[in-house]
Regions:
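Short solvent-exposed coil/turn linkers within tandem alpha-helical repeat scaffolds
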Residues: 1-6, 20, 34-42, 70-77, ...
Length: 127
């Protein structure tokens, strides 16, 4: 178990590497991070999903987005990762899963920025 300072350092380094497009390094640091804060934990898991998606490790990306959704149910991060999961599912031709994530987003967070234009994705995934 890491100290709180070490955890924040791992998170910060992981996010920095993610923004530098150094995805393997981002994954290494974010995997060392253990959150005591629910929101930060969700953001770290979501960032892992982004890194895995960039590396085309789509199964790991989806698992990370689902972990982010489950980690902290809130109006800030949950809609973000529901939309990312829906888009990833659509991109990987899992249309029923894409539709499910998109519909959950629309039903649970209708006023979130991520819900804007979500009907388009639901329509595409329904074909």
């Amino acid at each position: 178990s890491n100290t709180k300072a070490a955890d924040i350092a791992y998170y910060g380094a992981g996010m920095a590497y993610l923004h530098l497009n150094q995805y393997q390094d981002a994954i290494a640091y974010l995997n060392e991070f253990s959150a005591s804060d629910d929101l930060l934990g969700a953001l770290a898991k979501g960032a892992l999903g982004d890194a895995y998606a960039e590396l085309e490790s789509y199964d790991k990306a989806m698992a990370s987005y689902q972990a982010a959704i489950a980690h902290a149910d809130n109006e800030f991060s949950t809609p973000i990762y529901l939309k990312k999961a829906a888009l990833l599912a659509y991109q990987t031709n899992d249309f029923s899963k894409a539709k499910s994530f998109a519909e959950t987003l629309k039903e649970r967070f209708p006023d979130s920025p991520e819900s804007v234009n979500i009907d388009g994705l639901i329509g595409l995934a329904s074909k």
